[in-house]
Every structure is written in structure tokens, then in C-alpha cells.
Amino acid sequence: MRVLLAGGGTAGHTSPLLATADALRRLEPDVEITCLGTPRGLENKVVPEAGYPLELIPPVPLPRRPGADLLKVPFRLRAAVRATHAVLDRVRPDVVVGYGGYVSMPAYVATRKRGIPLVVHEQNTVPGLANRAGARFAQRVAVSFPDTPLRNAEYVGLPIRPMISGLDRAARRAEARAFFGLDPDRPTLLVTGGSQGARRLNQAVSAAAGALAATGVQVLHAQGKHGGADPQPGAEETGVPYVVVEYIDRMDLAYAAADLVICRAGANSVTEAAAVGLPAVFVPLPIGNGEQERNARPVIDAGGGILVKDADLTTDWVVGTVPPLVADAERLAAMGAAAAALIPRDADERLARIVLELGLGSSAR
């Protein structure tokens, strides 16, 4: 059986794609898996590192507003569909799985023309344009949140890797803090804006470095490719670690090291933090169609997280809120338990079984 997984751009698409790929391999070791992406996405790094072949097609950005870029979409789409047909000729998949993003629309169009079974997985509460289109003719549609408005949607959850879903944070804490060069005993704040980073978030938190250090709070800060994390001069003289990295490959250890995370509210960030029982301050991206705030809302309503609007995340807010929160072990434990109770940890295998059911039926014909 052969499977083509189409998705990429950011970790929001690549992480569930790779989690599904790994689950397929566990359930059906002989399955042949190929990933489909574009030359500009994170998939060019993480897919080969995970050991899966990667095919590339031109990206087809879908503008949210009318303009010159919208006029270019038909031409870009035709070129990308042609490239996808060439990939389908080489791979000959029995089933295609799409995760949204710039690569998915041409994959959906070409797959439909070939009559290949299609599975669509939507990561956010508010579906993107490509997945809204693909869901109209997909054989199966899976969603990460129970109230996502897609036709014939099945709630399976967001696929995450077992290294995350099965993480025992307390058991791995000492190892994790040593891995990142952190003190083994200090309260620890994790800061991440996702694979793309979040410059304003980075600046607001890093400017509080001295005040956080004065209260004994150490920080692990993944600033992303756009940077912006610049701990104030003198913060290092306190002896309290403030570790800045561009990207964290071992998010399992980052979660294990942390007592609290400040992050955006992409589906991946929300699901992973909740799954490991890590209390979170969610700062939704202030653009798009509001999907990030909606992603975080179930965790917030359950008491597992705090919502702070991007404009309200100031250095003063960080200084006034974070130290007393990370010092309140009872509140953190309650938040973590509330978040963890919401998340299905077997979504990777749930989605993989849907894919296998369709693909094995197709290959038998």
C-alpha cells in the first residue's frame, strides 16, 4: 500500500503529518509513505530528518482578500496541479492525505481528477480555504476540534507524536533541564512563538529577563527565525539562566523542563501543551480569521490556560503575572490536570486507521 501525505509550510502542518506517518508505520510496517510539500516550507528540513521521501511542487498561496495576488492564483494552481500529476505518476498512491496549506489545493485537485481516495485533516477550529474545498469531495474528513464546521467531519483530534503524547514531565524534568543548560531546581518558563517565531512576543518577554531573574525564574526561549529575543543587559549577571535558541527540535524535553509556557495558539501548540499537562499563557496571533483564539478557547474555558491578547502582552504584564503564577504549584497542577483531560492522545492512530481503511480498499481493487 502506498500513501501520499500532502502538507507543509509550518510546524502546524508538518507535525501532524509526521505523527500520522509514524503511526502508519507502526500499524502497517510495509506501507510506503511519501510526503508532498513546497520548496519554501519547514518540511524541507523535518521530513528528510524523519526518514521519509519528500516530493516538491510550486506553492499556491490563497489570498484572504481581493488583489493582484488573487489574479495569479489560477495560473499558479494550473502549474502546481501539473507538477502534482507528475508526482502521482511516480508515487502511484492508493490514498492521499491532505493537511491544508499551500501544497494542499493542487494535491486535492489532481487527486480528484485521478479518482484517488482522499482524506482531509483540518488542524484548526476554523478551517482554511484549501481544506474547505477539499472536504467537499474527500471520502473522509477528520478534524482536531469537535466543533470545526466541515462537511461530514469526524472528530479524531490532532495527531501528535508518542514522544509528546506519552511524556511524563515530572520523570523527565531533571534530564530536560540539563539538556538545555538550565538549573535543575528553579521555576522554569518556556517561551515559543511556533516555528515562525513571534517577534513582538519575543521582545515583550525578553525585556522582562532581569525582573524574572530577580524572582528566580529561569527561561527557555525559542525565538524562531525572525528573532527578537534580546534579554536586557545585565540579566546574565544574576546567574539565573535565560537560554535563547532559534528552534527546538526536542519539544518533548522543552515541555518536560517547563512549569509554564507562553505561546501562540496554533492548533499544534494548544494540543501539545494540553496533552502533556503544561499550563499555558496563550497569545493568539492577531491576524487571520480568529482561529487561534478559538483553538485555545476549550482549554481556557476548562481552566487549563490563560488568554492574553497580543496587544496586552507587555513586559509589565509578564513581570506582574509570571513570577506569582510559576510559584503557585497548586494552581499550576490544577491547570495542567484540566488541560490534559481534554485531549485525545491517540489521534495519530485514529487518523492512521482511517487512511489504512481507505488505502487498503483502494489497493485491493
From Swiss-Prot:
Assigned EC number: 2.4.1.227
Alphabetical UniProt keywords: Cell cycle, Cell division, Cell membrane, Cell shape, Cell wall biogenesis/degradation, Glycosyltransferase, Membrane, Peptidoglycan synthesis, Transferase
Enzyme class: transferase
Pfam families: Glyco_tran_28_C (PF04101), Glyco_transf_28 (PF03033)
GO biological process per UniProt: carbohydrate metabolic process; cell division; cell wall organization; lipid glycosylation; peptidoglycan biosynthetic process; regulation of cell shape
Annotated disulfide bonds: none
Location(s) in or outside the cell: Cell membrane
The keyword Cell membrane belongs to this UniProt entry's keyword annotation: yes
Origin: domain of life: Bacteria
InterPro entries documented for this protein: GlcNAc_MurG, Glyco_trans_28_C, GlycoTrans_28_N
UniProt catalytic activity: di-trans,octa-cis-undecaprenyl diphospho-N-acetyl-alpha-D-muramoyl-L-alanyl-D-glutamyl-meso-2,6-diaminopimeloyl-D-alanyl-D-alanine + UDP-N-acetyl-alpha-D-glucosamine = di-trans,octa-cis-undecaprenyl diphospho-[N-acetyl-alpha-D-glucosaminyl-(1->4)]-N-acetyl-alpha-D-muramoyl-L-alanyl-D-glutamyl-meso-2,6-diaminopimeloyl-D-alanyl-D-alanine + UDP + H(+)
Role according to the record: Cell wall formation. Catalyzes the transfer of a GlcNAc subunit on undecaprenyl-pyrophosphoryl-MurNAc-pentapeptide (lipid intermediate I) to form undecaprenyl-pyrophosphoryl-MurNAc-(pentapeptide)GlcNAc (lipid intermediate II).
HAMAP family in the cross-refs: MurG (MF_00033)
Record family assignment: Belongs to the glycosyltransferase 28 family. MurG subfamily.
Protein name: UDP-N-acetylglucosamine--N-acetylmuramyl-(pentapeptide) pyrophosphoryl-undecaprenol N-acetylglucosamine transferase
Native source organism of the sequence: Nocardioides sp. (strain ATCC BAA-499 / JS614)
Lineage: Bacteria, Bacillati, Actinomycetota, Actinomycetes, Propionibacteriales
